[in-house]
């Protein structure tokens, strides 16, 4: 992870990872709120 000369910028990786985490949490909480996530 110390190599900053990689092909993928670190900010891009962090942005994608953040959006993915928010999306997964959003779907999980939405499913639990609507009663569909109780089976997960």
UniProtKB/Swiss-Prot annotation:
It is a single-pass membrane protein. Its main location: plastid. The chain crosses the membrane at residues 8-28. SUPFAM superfamilies: Photosystem II reaction center protein J, PsbJ. Pfam families: PsbJ (PF01788). GO terms for cellular component: cyanelle thylakoid membrane; photosystem II reaction center. The keyword Lyase does not apply. InterPro entries: PSII_PsbJ (IPR002682), PSII_PsbJ_sf (IPR037267). It is found in: Plastid, Cyanelle thylakoid membrane. The keyword Membrane applies. Keywords: Cyanelle, Membrane, Photosynthesis, Photosystem II, Plastid, Reaction center, Thylakoid, Transmembrane, Transmembrane helix. GO terms for biological process: photosynthesis. PSII is composed of 1 copy each of membrane proteins PsbA, PsbB, PsbC, PsbD, PsbE, PsbF, PsbH, PsbI, PsbJ, PsbK, PsbL, PsbM, PsbT, PsbX, PsbY, PsbZ, Psb30/Ycf12, at least 3 peripheral proteins of the oxygen-evolving complex and a large number of cofactors. It forms dimeric complexes. Belongs to the PsbJ family. One of the components of the core complex of photosystem II (PSII). PSII is a light-driven water:plastoquinone oxidoreductase that uses light energy to abstract electrons from H(2)O, generating O(2) and a proton gradient subsequently used for ATP formation. It consists of a core antenna complex that captures photons, and an electron transfer chain that converts photonic excitation into a charge separation. NCBIfam families: PRK02565.1 (NF002722). This is Photosystem II reaction center protein J. It comes from Cyanophora paradoxa.
């Amino acid at each position: 992870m110390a190599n900053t000369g990689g092909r993928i910028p670190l900010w891009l990786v962090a942005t994608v990872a953040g959006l993915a985490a928010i999306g997964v949490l959003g779907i999980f909480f939405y499913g639990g709120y609507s009663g569909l996530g109780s089976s997960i």
